[in-house]
């Protein structure tokens, strides 16, 4: 029951404010399922909605013989040293599945917490079965002062005419290195929406999820990233449009206040009549730091439509002066501009997830200004 889970959050020694930083709720009525993992141990998992399954990957493999067929199906074990590290017997992670035709609007919540291990190895499998709709919010964080590495393998399967939105909020520490490896398969008529939020300091994040998008399917990636002094973030998204009339959109908002950001984006038009748009915008808030945008558009057929726009710079003084003329102080004007820059309205995202994103951005403002 959810009441028991509230106690387990307390046992982790994480206060409610830290949980809020990664969108974690303690109210059963606001979630359709929950999963909580500390280091390599799945502490609790439950489903509160008939059309969704939530369990550890170990339990899923015991319950269903076919789950093993989804392991390393769209990612290679030998992709790099970090995928090889994750291919171990003690790996754990979440298994979340919406049943055929189920409409799960209330989000499933997954929390991955690094408490004391040197390397947290996770392998997650998410399946949105045919005609279903599934929304997930994943909050990843670490115990204050702990040094370590999070290696997260995630494979997403969006079946025919299904829709999956996945919002991931990270809040680590300057002693944590993060190496997610993610792939997504979007079948005919399916929709995948990814929202990645990183606003707090971290030692290093390096991630480049890839979506394989089939006929009449859509993949959308949104990211809001802040790098404070000492943080290095190498992040991007890739979409392979491999089916006729498939679509992709990659939108990133990056802010450097002394940190280093490499913002990547890659759309491959590998079928006729596909469309893709890539948008990279960066904001420099200090004299130090770096934002390096690396967009790539690749057309393999003549009748594709791929577009890109990018801009990196500082806050324009004219914008500050305009808001000050409307009665705001200089600090208030800068705060309003930064908040507006980070906010991305995502069509089709449930209000509960929109609110989690807005709340996370508001909490991060105090460290930016």
Curated annotation (Swiss-Prot):
It comes from the Archaea. SUPFAM superfamilies: Stabilizer of iron transporter SufD (SSF101960). GO terms for biological process: iron-sulfur cluster assembly. PANTHER family: FES CLUSTER ASSEMBLY PROTEIN SUF, UPF0051 PROTEIN ABCI8, CHLOROPLASTIC-RELATED. Belongs to the iron-sulfur cluster assembly SufBD family. This is Iron-sulfur cluster assembly SufBD family protein AF_2365. It comes from Archaeoglobus fulgidus (strain ATCC 49558 / DSM 4304 / JCM 9628 / NBRC 100126 / VC-16). The lineage of its organism: Archaea, Methanobacteriati, Methanobacteriota, Archaeoglobi, Archaeoglobales.
